[in-house]
């Protein structure tokens, strides 16, 4: 698989996991497996991964009321991976990001 990592999943809960337990949460491709995720994190961030847990999240149903009636739809399904690193290791999400004022 090319690169299963889509983006870091930054929420209040995931930030708490990072601070307390050293676990990082990523949104990954639906067909990604734990081995691909482990290899991608180790290669991209240069850290040792202790374990990977995955969660398949179902997309929410959406309804929109218009003049012509009800339009029903659905958000896409997605998958998240909770990656635990070895002791003393950490990931800096923002190391490659440029400041907003530049470029």
Curated annotation (Swiss-Prot):
Keywords: Ribonucleoprotein, Ribosomal protein, RNA-binding, rRNA-binding. The keyword RNA-binding applies. GO terms for molecular function: rRNA binding; structural constituent of ribosome. GO terms for biological process: translation. SUPFAM superfamilies: Ribosomal proteins S24e, L23 and L15e (SSF54189). Gene3D superfamilies: 3.30.70.330. Signal peptide: none annotated. The keyword RNA-binding applies. NCBIfam families: PRK05738.1-3, PRK05738.2-4. One of the early assembly proteins it binds 23S rRNA. One of the proteins that surrounds the polypeptide exit tunnel on the outside of the ribosome. Forms the main docking site for trigger factor binding to the ribosome. Part of the 50S ribosomal subunit. Contacts protein L29, and trigger factor when it is bound to the ribosome. This is Large ribosomal subunit protein uL23. It comes from Chlorobium luteolum (strain DSM 273 / BCRC 81028 / 2530) (Pelodictyon luteolum). The gene is rplW.
